Regions:
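Bacterial N-terminal signal peptides
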Residues: 1-10
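Sec/Tat signal peptide C-region and signal peptidase I cleavage site
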Residues: 12-16
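SH3-family beta-barrel domains
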Residues: 17-52, 63-67, 74-77, 84-86, ...
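Beta-strand-rich domains and repeat architectures in extracellular enzymes and scaffolds
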Residues: 58-60
């Protein structure tokens, strides 16, 4: 069994962004992009200013320093997107600092635990790796219950509800 216990500062490798699926009928969509709201994205760079409002005239309330960090887009205004992180902090960022590449944070609500990455989409398959809470993983696909994830030195499946960056039951292709 390969044991991969990664530190929270590890970032997942870059991957090409897929075009999001059209929103289901009746779902809220952004007035600028026409994409579903809310939706997940990730930070494109290692330094992203989170602002109080949608312009550079608004004060910076936080600076993210972690490329690949998943965030939830909750609103759109011109070139600005209102986002929320896994801890509930909200603010506005330039759209160019966001990527459609799907990433997830392992076990964000359970900070002191390690989580199994299995060789198949079942708890009965071999454990391929163990990841500490806070590790960022790239999401290849999800079937609504399990996600195929990968990162530096590992690839396998995780229970979807152990990831922040995909909605419960969401299918990702």
């Amino acid at each position: 069994m390969v044991f991969a216990c990664l530190l929270a500062l590890c970032a997942a490798p870059a991957a090409a962004a897929d075009t999001p699926a059209p929103p289901p009928a009746g779902a809220a969509v952004g007035t600028v992009t026409g994409l579903p709201l809310p939706r997940y994205a990730s930070l494109k760079t290692d330094r992203v200013n989170l602002r109080e409002g949608p312009s550079k005239d608004h004060a910076t309330k936080w600076v993210f320093e972690r490329a690949g960090l998943p965030v939830e887009i909750t609103a759109e205004f011109s070139i600005w997107r209102r986002i929320r992180d896994s801890e509930g902090t909200e603010g506005w960022v330039l759209h160019t600092l966001l990527s459609g590449r799907r990433t997830a944070l392992v076990g964000s609500a359970k900070k002191d635990e390690a989580f199994n990455v299995t060789s198949g989409p079942s708890a009965k398959t071999d454990v391929a790796a163990r990841l500490q809470a806070g590790v960022i993983v790239s999401v290849k696909r999800c079937d609504g219950a399990w996600c195929l994830i990968y990162g530096d030195g590992f690839k396998g499946y995780m229970v979807q509800t152990d990831l922040w960056g995909v909605y419960p039951g969401e299918k990702v292709d």
